[in-house]
């Protein structure tokens, strides 16, 4: 199988006052390219921590994470995060003083400063995510929650990352909007070959993914 991300013998812990709190112990797992994963578990079990580690925003205490067979530490965390991985948060994490166009363009300029995209191309691109010209010209804090999340997803995909990490992306959305967002993720996987890894508390949404990963808080590990 084509493993785009591979976790090898990973330990992660942190100091909590005088105590050491272990989150993961000897974690091993491989994520296949072009698959849709959900991560489920109790609050505080380490779901978001796992996403942060996969994004290269923190380092494991032991072990390694491989992207395309290379340790992300050797790739360089900054390069890895900018070029290969995009994160979508529950609270959208958009630049509220900018409109949808400029949110996407700002992200592109950070991930690939040499890349140019025309207004016409951006119009067509955002429209595929349900953001028409009128909405695209509004400051994003004037859009609905579902529309803001669509902009966040469009921004992530525009950066051409192969991996999309989503932390409770539907947590603030109603049921119908949540289903629409899940449909977008499915299209990214099936039509564009992206790998989507999503944290969720929603069992119904988790069952829409290809693989459900459970975090075992007692054994500090994961299983399908």
Language-model features and meaning:
Residues 63-72:
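Conserved ABC transporter NBD signature motif
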Residues 55:
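Helix-to-loop junction immediately C-terminal to a conserved catalytic motif
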Residues 139-143, 147:
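Conserved ABC ATPase signature
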Residues 5, 22-24:
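Conserved structural motif at the start of ABC-family nucleotide-binding domains
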Residues 72-86:
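ABC ATPase NBD coupling module
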Residues 117-134:
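Conserved ABC ATPase "signature" region
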Residues 164-167:
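Catalytic Walker B motif of ABC-type/P-loop ATPase nucleotide-binding domains
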């Amino acid at each position: 199988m084509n493993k785009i991300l591979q976790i090898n013998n990973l330990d992660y812990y942190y100091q909590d006052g005088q105590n050491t709190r272990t989150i993961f112990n000897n974690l091993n797992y491989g994520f296949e390219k072009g698959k849709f994963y959900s991560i489920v578990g109790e609050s505080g079990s380490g779901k978001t921590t796992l996403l942060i580690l996969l994004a290269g925003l923190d380092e494991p205490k032991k072990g390694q994470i491989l992207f395309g067979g290379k340790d992300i530490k050797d790739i360089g965390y900054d390069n890895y995060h900018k070029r290969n991985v995009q994160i979508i948060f529950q609270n959208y994490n958009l630049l509220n003083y900018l409109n949808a166009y400029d949110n996407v363009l700002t992200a592109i300029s950070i991930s690939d400063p040499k890349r140019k995209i025309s207004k016409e191309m951006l119009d067509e691109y955002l429209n595929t995510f349900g953001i028409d010209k009128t909405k695209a010209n509004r400051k994003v804090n004037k859009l609905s929650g579902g529309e803001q999340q669509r902009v966040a997803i469009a921004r992530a995909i525009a950066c051409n990352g192969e991996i999309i990490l989503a932390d409770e992306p539907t947590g603030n959305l109603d049921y119908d909007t949540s289903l629409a967002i899940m449909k977008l993720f499915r299209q990214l996987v099936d039509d564009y070959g992206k790998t989507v890894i999503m944290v969720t508390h929603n069992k119904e949404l988790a069952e829409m993914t290809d693989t459900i990963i459970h975090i075992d808080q007692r054994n500090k590990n994961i299983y399908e």
